[in-house]
Amino acid sequence: GRGDVYKRQIRVRAVPGSGKTFALTKRIVYLILELYVEPSSIVAMTFTNKAANEMKYRLKKMIGDFATCYAGTFHGYCNLILKEEIYRLSYPKTFVILDKKAQVDLIREVADELGFSLKDFTAKEYADKICEEKQDRAYIPLMLDTGREALQKKISHTQDPFYQVYYSYLKKQRDNYVLDFEDIIQFAIYILTQYKEALKKWQSRCQYLLCDEYQDVNKNQEYLLYL
């Protein structure tokens, strides 16, 4: 029947501005009003806060108080996961998320403590390189209690100025329970892959998963979608 179409995986391919986001919004409305899907079991991922706010506005306009599904960014959803699950890594749920400026400031602070003097441009370059390093989740164990000794060894043994700053930056993050933008998705994936009960809980909550602008997802965002 018609409802079966809404239960299958569907990819909509069309040129920009042709109404893909509107089609996704209408799909959510149909799931809730016609198939009686619990709104809280629907997750709609977008790439920007602007797109998320637009979707929320449309949903509110179409279905009013039924618009209680999650419609937001990947980072926003992963932040929800971390608020509930980060205790598993011995981090408090009051952890702090750095914006780009605060991250650059922390990098400069770490460099100063190491005796380096980083200019603004160099500190921003280091921030970009740290972002690249964090595309692989192998760094996360270094930011846990069990990785303190291994991290200290890396700080002591590396001669490369960037890696001295990088590993000291990880230590500073861990000591102060601070995450940067890259950590949000990576920590969420790490928890969901290391703790099966956490994965099952979030899978059971998310019965319908929708993603706007799927062609723009990176490998980590795609990995999250398929968990």
Residue ranges and their predicted role:
Residues 33, 83, 112, 174, ...:
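Residues at helix-coil transition
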Residues 4, 8-16, 23, 43, ...:
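Conserved helicase NTPase motor core
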Residues 4-93, 97, 200:
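P-loop NTPase Walker
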